Each structure stands twice: as structure tokens, then as C-alpha cells.
Amino acid sequence: MKIKRAIIAPVVVALLAMGTGGWFLQRGVGQERNIYANARMFEDVLRRLSDNFVDAKQPAELYQMALEGMLENLGDPHTSVMVARDYDRLRLQTQGEYGGIGIQIDRKHGWITVISPLPGTPGMRAGLQAGDQIIEVNGETTKDWDTDMAVSKLRGPKGSVVRIKVARGGVDQPIPFEITREEIHIQAVPSTYMMDGNVGYVEMVTFSESSTDELRRSIEQLRAQGARGAILDLRRNPGGLLDQGVSVADLFLSRGQTVVETKGRVAEQNQRAVARTADQFPGFPLVVLVGPQSASAAEIVAGALQDHDRALVVGRTTYGKGSVQTLYPLQADNWLKVTTARWYTPVGRSIQKPYGIDAPHPVEGDAPAAEPAALEQEEKPEYRTASGRTVLGGGGIHPDLVTTPDTLTQPEREFLQDLQKHGSAYTDARLSFAVSYLRTTPGIQPGFAVTTAMADAFYHALVQAGVSVDRDKYDRAQRWVMRDLGYYITYSKWGEQAAQQRANADDPEVHMAAALLRGATTPQSLFTLAARFAARRAPQPQP
């Protein structure tokens, strides 16, 4: 099957298709009579409202209200009418370069919500977080905006400023941000490095046109350095181009194996994508890390490798974005975007979560503890992989080893809640401190230690910047502060890969994956080790 190139924009897939007329001709005569009867009743209601409603309404306004109500009642946030300028924006999104702040967004509960700030972008540096609801852009409320409207407002010329306010869980007041737009270029694989024990680490943060080539080069580089297995980290990957998701999975699957299927009411929407080449890294053990920010194309890759027993999936349940949208042309250069199909993994699991069920967003700094997938609270349908292993359905990709977030200490939570009230003021002060520290410490090395003296100096820098924090809370949250400082000083000096490598040193999910890979020689031995690991963590029956 040939899958046309598509882009998630943001986190929605647009498979461009030409619509055809003759809708009435495709229906039976009886249905046509009912349609005309309903149309006459609709026109009668509209005319009487236009003539008699206490507040004057123009017919065009009433038609628009009816159209919006019809689409709203479908219960599908991705089905909508796009005017010509919206369609032009959608085409712009396929070009891969634009002036913006670098965040992936979706519409949830009537508000534009941050799914993921992209690494190295103004949005990430400003401190935007997954789960933030953008409630204002340049003084305009975003209530009931669709994603296309939000994209048009958030994007703009390089160097221009956008002012936003976000609502964040645990913070009483909206948080203001003032962010300077930059030209956004997304590097698909920002981090590739060797860990101890001949284990490689690769992080992929998007599925762009270069994703497959970047990942192939990264795996080849790691193997040349002696890697006997690798971690593929998709935890911060909100998706991207569908065809790149298919080709990334193709790197590790055998020719002819199913990657993903689409199923809809119309026959042409029922398609199957298969691997076109042989496994390019046969026998190479692979652990895929996923989480609530892993979406769409990232879920296709994780699901395909899991179903074919090619990779062990570790982490938390993914976002669950698995629907296909098709564009149909309307009059006056308008377009109808319709959800026409859903994605299914090779064993038949639907990737799409039911609307209204949101993936939980972990609190920054939470540490996971492993639990077997069977211990998840709600019951989910079971499926069998190619070798007979049990995997769970119900929307999203459920890992083979599920991690549950541990909590920050109460003082750390209180400190973070206080910081969030200051919006980007904290991140601005942190960046200034990092720049100043690097200027006065020219011989610094990547493995530097953050000392208590540095933490004390940072506290005074916050006070001078107008970020008022309680000193006692600050001292009791010093573990978090020191990790945060270490990450951002590293980021400022050596870039994303060095910062990610430092963060991974304290990441229990990465440590868990690496420990499993060190004992594995083949994908099959990796599954055996994981099963033993899960059995040790399972609760024992009570006598």
C-alpha cells in the first residue's frame, strides 16, 4: 500500500483528498425524500427565526450557527470547516520552517492545550509545560479556538513577540509569558550517545522528513562504537509525518510485516502499510521508552515494534491520537476536514483513545517505579503479539513494563507551585545565572557538580530578578534546584544532547531500560528478562 505523505498539524493528521459531488445520488430514493423534508423544515425554522426572534439575526449568521452546531454535536474535535486562510496555514505547516515559539498543541475541553514544548525552542526555554492551557494570546481569549486559529496567532515573523497567558494545574492565577518568536527548525534526533555496558541511547523528538535517515545514522554510529542494544526514547515525541512513522518502523521490521492499518466507513479508507525492506538491524535488542506526550506517529512506531515482538516498550501509556482526517473542497475556497478513519496496530488495537479521556501529565521531577502492565487499574482488552505475548488495547500504546510516577517531596511541590506563579521570570533568571556562571568559570567540564554555594548564589539572583520565593522552601527543595541548575547550565554550554545525557543520569526509566539491555543478547532474551523483572514486582497473593 502506498500511504500519501501527511502531517500532524499540530497533533492532527491531514490526508489531502479530492472530494466528489453527487452526495444525493449515492443515497436511496427514500433517504432522499427524508433529506428534502428535513431541509424544508430547516428552512422554515430559519426563516421564522430570522423574521421573529427577539434579537435580530441575519440568515447567514443562523446558517453558520447551524453548521457549527452540527459539527459540535459529532463529538469529534478534529472535524471542522476550514476557510481559505486556514487551508493556506495548513499547507504552510507542511513546509517545516516558520516563525513561532515551538510547541505542539491540541484542543482539549474547549481550550488550546500544550501537548509538548519542542526541545531547543523559545517555548521550552520560556518554561511552557505539557498540560498548560493557553487562555490568552496577545490579549485575546482562546476559548473555543480551534488549533488552526491558535497556530495563526502564535506564529509570526522571526523576532516578533507574542504574549500569552496559561492556566496550569495547581496554580490559582493565570501565568503570563512574553516569548520572542524564532525560525523553527526541528532536529528529529537531538541526542545520540553511548552509555555504560555497551548500551546506546537515541532520543527522537519528532517525525519530520529527515527522521528515518537521522535514526538510521544514529543506530549505525552506536553500533560502530560497540553498542549491543539501544534505547529509543519517544517520551517527548508528539508525532509528525505519517510516512516517516511507517519508514522508521520499517528500519526494524521484516519485509511484508504490517506497520499500521487504517479503518473507516468508506472502502478507500481501509488501507494497510507494510515494511518494504528487510530488518536493517537484525537481532539488535531495542527498548522503546514512551509516555503521555508520545502521540500519533510515535504511537504507530511503538505499537508496530511491540506487536511484532521487535522491541520492549517501557514507560507510561501514550497520548492516544489515532484518527485520520481527510480534506474535502467546498464552495468559496472553503474546506471540510472530516475524521474518516482510525489507526490500528498490526494485531488490531485502536490507537485512538475515546474523546474526553486525557493522558495524565506527570509533574516535572517525578520518578517512576516499575509495575507490570496487568496491574493497571481499569480493565482493558487483551491482544496477542506474534509470539503470543499479551498486550493491552483501549487506546494509546500500553507499555510492556508500565512505570507509575513517584511523587516529589512536599517541600519540592510547594516550591514549584510558588515558582509557577512567576511565569517566565524564573526561567529568565535561570538563564541569566547560567550565562553569568559560565562567563566566570571558563574551565568548566560537562560532569561538573552543582554546589550548595551555587544554589545559594542562585537564590540571591532570583531575589534580584524580582522572583520572590520563601528561603525556607527554597532550601528544602534544594535537591530539585540543584538538578535544574545543572541541566540548564549544561544546556547553555554544550547544547541539548549534553543536557539530556545529564538528565538521564537521574532518570529511573532510562536506568531500567539500560539494565535490561545489558543482560540481553537478542530481542527474545530481552522479553525474558522483562518478564522476570515484572514477576518480581507483582504483588504476592495474601495467605
Mark where each language-model region is.
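Conserved functional hotspot residues or short segments at active or partner-binding sites
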Residues: S350-I351, Y355-P543
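Stable alpha-helical elements in mature extracytoplasmic
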Residues: N38-V45, L62-M70, D86, G110, ...
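Extended, small/polar residue-biased N-terminal targeting/export presequences
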Residues: F53-I115, V161-S191, V260, N504-A514, ...
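Cleft-lining beta-strand/loop regions that shape enzyme active-site pockets
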Residues: W23-N38, S50-V54, Q58-P59, T113-A130, ...
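Residue-level signature of catalytic and energy-coupling elements of molecular machines
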Residues: V45, A66, I103, I164, ...
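Short, Lys/Arg-rich N-terminal segment immediately upstream of the first membrane anchor
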Residues: M1-K4
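Polar, glycine-rich mid-to-C-terminal structural blocks
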Residues: A297, D309, R316, G320-P381
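Hydrophobic membrane-insertion alpha-helices, especially the h-region
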Residues: I8-W23
